[in-house]
Amino acid sequence: MKRAFIMVLDSFGIGATEDADRFGDVGSDTLGHIAEACAKGEADNGRKGPLNLPNLTRLGLVKAHEGSTGKIAAGMDGNADVIGAYAWAHELSSGKDTPSGHWEIAGVPVLFDWGYFSDHENSFPQELLDKLVKRANLPGYLGNCHSSGTVILDQLGEEHMKTGKPIFYTSADSVFQIACHEETFGLDKLYELCEIAREELTVGGYNIGRVIARPFIGDKAGNFQRTGNRHDLAVEPPAPTVLQKLVDEKQGHVVSVGKIADIYANCGITKKVKATGLDALFDATLKEMKEAGDKTIVFTNFVDFDSSWGHRRDIAGYAAGLELFDRRLPELMELVGEDDILILTADHGCDPSWTGTDHTREHIPVLIYGPKVKPGSLGHRETFADIGQTLATYFGTSPMDYGKNML
């Protein structure tokens, strides 16, 4: 029985790539800077001491980081026995965004340039805004700018509740984000608005990767909170991913846990499981692993590393999240069967010590574990698509156009 379990620790980069200068990210290092802060006692809020990730270390995380950066992460064990195969991978895609990283992991790098809304104020074309107001029968809109998702709620959340005007905002990513109150505006109405925005962006040729619904609750600035009912409307990958090939060619199954299905626009997904928060995502993953049959991929995105701690530049929160994940990792490893493979990886970096609030261009870890996986270094990988090609070889699908088998 062949099964693959893919765990994406969203934004968990392990050191700047060779082309990081193109992105202003030279010196970024999500793992390294978290470990450094922990070792200095600068991340003791809700946790304490050096970064403690013994299980990820045994799978080769510290070695992969050393390969990427040339140094051992502060306070971590560079001499631990390694029981998995490990690598550090460079992104071939032109961006450092979520769809690009995930699609490339599945064997389809993004070699075109996304469209972006680059102006920090009055970010969106008036023609687009007018169409949204007319089609959705809106009283107007708020925002129309670049912003952090939590900051803009404090700035405009109360006005949104009074006026019913949705909050439109973007970032350095190829995104159009819409924040609305779940109760006063309504979740269904928000989703309908996002569908309209997706249509207009596609028809208008803006080439925007995602429209993101950002529902929130609360009653005043300071206590607004985004909920777990986020919904991403992505464009479809430009070519069949290894997920699609497994389903189409082998009549296999792909189980999405978390936001995976949204990222792939449901292409190649046979089952969707929603969960919010690190523990809930982990619990849902364990349940699906226990139930998974032959020719199945269980694919989970642990979004909190990115959304809750990376973008918010919360080093202590990120460290605590990693330590929680590591404590629970043995539960997951115990479910890996004789012919199974477990792959732990990321989709980009989001260094919580870095300036700004955006992603960072970094190598990602590729940690592969299974009874038949030979432990040791798989070296520097030129593309995330090596993961997709490895899965294609493992399941016996037709080969991907990009990437090399690692096993």
Swiss-Prot record:
Cofactors required: Mn(2+)
Record-linked Pfam families: Metalloenzyme
One Gene Ontology cellular component annotation held by this UniProt entry: cytosol
Gene Ontology MF term list: magnesium ion binding; manganese ion binding; phosphopentomutase activity
Functional pathway: Carbohydrate degradation; 2-deoxy-D-ribose 1-phosphate degradation; D-glyceraldehyde 3-phosphate and acetaldehyde from 2-deoxy-alpha-D-ribose 1-phosphate: step 1/2
Textual note on the cofactor: Binds 2 manganese ions.
Ligand binding (Mn(2+) 2): 306, 311, 359
InterPro entries reported for this sequence: Alkaline_phosphatase_core_sf (IPR017850), DeoB (IPR010045), Metalloenzyme (IPR006124), Phosphopentomutase_DeoB_cap_sf (IPR024052)
One BP term from GO: metabolic compound salvage
HAMAP family: Phosphopentomut (MF_00740)
Protein name: Phosphopentomutase
